[in-house]
Amino acid sequence: MPTINQLVRHGRKRSVKKTNTPALKASPQKRGVCTRVYTTTPKKPNSALRKVARVRLTTGMEVTAYIPGVGHNLQEHSVVLVRGGRVKDLPGVRYHIVRGTLDSIGVQDRKQGRSHYGAKKPK
């Protein structure tokens, strides 16, 4: 336990929290251009072909972002909006692409959880 005098001289040390999304530079989302769109396989107990894209952000950094939902229209030079949020079974994928904004269209025929996939309300 420090004395009052020690606290006056040195003060308390602030703990610095390391960010999980450094490429966003403390913004909620960032715009970027797809440089490569491809599929990759997840870690050990799971098996699939996960759709991911390599994106060059406006901050100048290049990140790997996950494309959520069933089917997508993204290709090289597509302009996308990237948010934070990792994919647990894909190592190195710490960002998600926001569906339904810029060049990324929303998921077709989506009835539930539509707001996460940029899908309009069905008529």
UniProtKB/Swiss-Prot annotation:
GO terms for biological process: translation. One of its GO terms (molecular function) is structural constituent of ribosome. Residues 1-32 are annotated as: Disordered. Keywords: Methylation, Ribonucleoprotein, Ribosomal protein, RNA-binding, rRNA-binding, tRNA-binding. It comes from the Bacteria. Belongs to the universal ribosomal protein uS12 family. With S4 and S5 plays an important role in translational accuracy. This is Small ribosomal subunit protein uS12. It comes from Desulfatibacillum aliphaticivorans. The gene is rpsL.
